[in-house]
Amino acid sequence: DEVSEVVQEAANKVIVFVPFKHAIDIVADRLRKDGFSTEIVSGAVSMKARTKIFKDFQESDDPRVLVIQPQSASHGVTLTAADTIVWFAPIASVETWLQANERINRPSQKNKMTIIKIYGSEVEKRVYDALESKEANQKTLVSLYEQELKA
């Protein structure tokens, strides 16, 4: 229900990252039941099909929502038709977290971006907090290297 509420309130397209294979179909089916055109991108989807889904998402009205397994689209994909990301559950990899969130943060993005984290327990909230802390540390580290290179 929370995911559908976010999609309903979003002005533009939405990406929902679902880390667990068994939950991807459940989330997509619920969104479809609630009337949202939805496509799935996971490891089970061929590269040719992914390319078509991404192209349609960027260039057409439908699909409105992509339900994505984060590892399947965390690198090399521009999805700026969306300005909202929903994390259905946290992941362990800070690199995948950063890269997945960057799918909507491109020079062609014209809208304010929103990242929403859904959690069902205090442990999941702490995992999100840890990801954000690692993200801040990684950005600080990169900044230090950049300063050193300029010196």
Where are these regions (language model features)?
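Conserved catalytic network of the ASCE P-loop NTPase/AAA+ motor domain
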Residues: 7-9, 56-60, 77-79
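A conserved SF2-helicase RecA2
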Residues: 92-151
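A short beta-strand element within the Helicase C-terminal
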Residues: 77-90, 113-117
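Conserved helicase ATPase core of P-loop NTP-dependent helicases/translocases
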Residues: 15-17, 25, 32-73
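Short, solvent-exposed loop/turn segments at secondary-structure junctions
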Residues: 20-24, 45-46, 72-73, 91-93, ...
